[in-house]
Regions:
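Central mid-sequence intracellular linker of multi-pass
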Residues: 156-170, 191-265
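Conserved MFS/SLC helix-loop-helix module at the cytosolic interface between two early adjacent transmembrane helices
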Residues: 86-126
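Cytosolic juxtamembrane N-terminal segment immediately preceding the first transmembrane helix
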Residues: 1-55, 65
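Extracytoplasmic gate region of multi-pass secondary transporters
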Residues: 56-57, 178, 263-319
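Hydrophobic core of transmembrane alpha-helices in multi-pass small-molecule transporters
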Residues: 115, 127-141, 149
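Residue-level signature of mid-helix packing/kink "hotspots" within the transmembrane helices
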Residues: 53, 81-90, 140, 175, ...
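Extracellular/periplasmic helix-loop-helix junction of adjacent transmembrane segments
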Residues: 56-88
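Helix-breaking motifs and short loop linkers at transmembrane-helix boundaries and internal kinks
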Residues: 51, 67-68, 91, 99-100, ...
């Protein structure tokens, strides 16, 4: 009887020991994912907002006068940026299914950094609109692409805090850009014949480039596309095959009927709900016509706030 009791106790101790080791391995894996996956996407989103808010800071720090921007030029340039951002979101997400995220996200970061550098040489409003549009095409990979990446590494109960940290990094970028512009304008305005707002874009690029390099070397991408023997990557020194196998196995298997690729388009159109929603969006002409009028004719200015009620009436929300 005593032997059986000792045997049961020994089994319980061994079971607890195994469970404890698994918990330690899980925490270590999560720490590595946070350190190399979450850190890169947060840095990417942070510099995304530094670049984005930096444009507005440059506008009020001399760019408006130097380039003779008038009227709604700032609004138009921001609208061009948003058009590029919207246009680029879906293609960027589809590219993540064809090209490893380590390569694509790093490339996009480098590309918009290079375009940011080009902003310091602009001499006209047309140059600004062209660069801002292509900047937005590459920057649009960040938000939706990041949530796709995070959803591939983290379980459902692990995502909220990571998503909050990721979103917060963008807000920090907005604040940092303002402080940086103040310092640049104070110390570099006129240095080497360049206005302070031009130095802002140069320094933005100098910050963006190391982040792109960091992503290419240390960011592991997706668990399914990551190997412990990856070339040109530090993944083989960060994760071992056992950890990568566990990272893939601990998440629920993907339902192939919800797979996002080029076959998604005909699936949506064939489905009655998706097709009807698309047609309804085009049919509700009042929605986009009212915005078109507001953008092209009146513009978003304080003196035009009086038109807001008329726009709301046009859209049918008030009698």
């Amino acid at each position: 009887m005593m032997k059986e009791s000792k045997s049961i106790t020994q089994h319980e101790v061994e079971r607890e020991s195994v469970s404890s080791k698994r918990a330690i391995k899980k925490r270590l894996l999560l720490f590595k994912i946070d350190l190399f996956v979450l850190s890169f996407v947060c840095l990417q989103y942070w510099i995304n907002y530094v670049d984005r808010v930096g444009f507005t800071n440059a506008y009020i720090s001399g760019m408006k006068e130097d380039l003779k921007m008038v009227g709604n030029d700032l609004t138009v340039s921001n609208t061009v940026f948003m058009i590029g951002y919207i246009v680029g979101m879906v293609p960027n997400n589809l590219m993540l299914l064809c090209v490893p995220p380590r390569i694509w996200l790093s490339f996009c970061t480098f590309a918009w950094g290079l375009l940011t550098l080009g902003m310091y040489k602009v001499t006209s409003f047309k140059h600004i609109c062209a660069i801002r549009f292509f900047q937005a095409l590459f920057e649009s990979c960040t938000f939706s692409g990041t949530h796709f990446v995070l959803g591939s590494w983290y379980k459902e109960d692990e995502l909220p805090i990571r998503s909050a940290i990721f979103t917060g990094s963008g807000l920090v970028g907005s604040m940092f850009s303002g402080f940086m512009q103040t310092s640049i304008f104070t110390h570099l305005n006129g240095r080497n014949g360049l206005a302070g707002w031009r130095w802002l874009f140069i320094i933005d690029f100098c910050i963006t480039l190391p982040i792109a390099i960091y992503g290419f070397i240390f960011f592991p991408g997706l668990p399914d596309q990551t190997s412990a023997v990856s070339k040109f990557s530090m993944t083989r020194y960060i994760f071992n095959e056992q950890e990568l196998h566990y990272a893939r196995r601990r998440l629920p298997a993907r339902d192939e009927s919800t797979r996002l690729d080029w076959s998604t388009i005909p699936r949506v159109l064939k489905g009655g709900t998706g097709g009807c929603s698309l047609l309804f969006g085009f049919w509700e002409v009042r929605t986009w016509v009212s915005h078109l009028i507001l953008h092209l004719h009146y513009g978003y200015k304080t003196k035009n706030i009086r038109w807001r009620k008329e726009i709301i009436i046009l859209r049918g929300y008030l009698p």
